[in-house]
C-alpha cells in the first residue's frame, strides 16, 4: 500500500463488518476473486509514524482463491456500494474452478499494479503479501 492509504479516514473496526469486499489475486492471464468478510486494517513493524499499513484477511484454505494467494506476491481488496451485493453474493457462492464467475457476476476485472481488481469498486487497496499461514 502506498502513503495515500494513510491520508484517508477509515473505520477499521467496521469496514469488513458493514461493507462487502472481494479479494482478487493473479494476473491478466489467470486470476480469481472471492468474497471476504473477515479482515481488518492496521499497522505493524515500525517505529511510531513509520509502521507498515496492513490489511489482514482470512481465507479458508479450500477456496480456489487460496491457491492464487500461495503463488502471488500482490492482491487487491475491493469494497463496493450496496448495489453490488448481488454480484458479490455470486462471487461468494460460486467457484472460479468451474466457470468465469467474475463475468457471470456481472463485474469487470481490470489490471491494478501487478494484479487485478474491479472497475465497479468504490475503493481498492493494492496489497503486497507479507505473511501467509
Give the predicted meaning of each segment:
Residues 1-133:
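Active-site-proximal mixed secondary-structure blocks
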Amino acid at each position: 500500500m502506498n502513503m495515500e492509504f494513510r491520508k484517508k479516514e477509515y473505520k477499521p473496526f467496521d469496514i469488513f463488518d458493514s461493507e462487502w469486499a472481494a479479494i482478487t489475486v493473479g494476473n491478466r492471464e489467470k486470476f480469481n476473486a472471492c468474497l471476504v468478510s473477515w479482515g481488518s486494517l492496521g499497522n505493524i513493524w515500525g517505529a511510531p509514524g513509520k509502521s507498515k499499513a496492513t490489511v489482514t484477511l482470512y481465507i479458508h484454505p479450500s477456496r480456489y482463491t487460496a491457491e492464487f494467494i500461495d503463488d502471488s506476491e500482490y492482491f487487491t481488496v475491493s469494497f463496493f456500494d450496496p448495489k453490488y451485493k448481488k454480484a458479490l453474493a455470486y462471487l461468494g457462492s460460486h467457484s472460479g474452478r468451474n466457470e468465469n464467475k467474475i463475468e457471470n457476476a456481472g463485474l469487470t476485472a481490470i489490471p491494478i499494479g501487478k494484479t487485478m481488481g474491479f472497475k465497479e469498486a468504490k475503493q481498492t487497496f493494492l496489497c503486497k503479501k507479507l505473511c501467509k499461514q
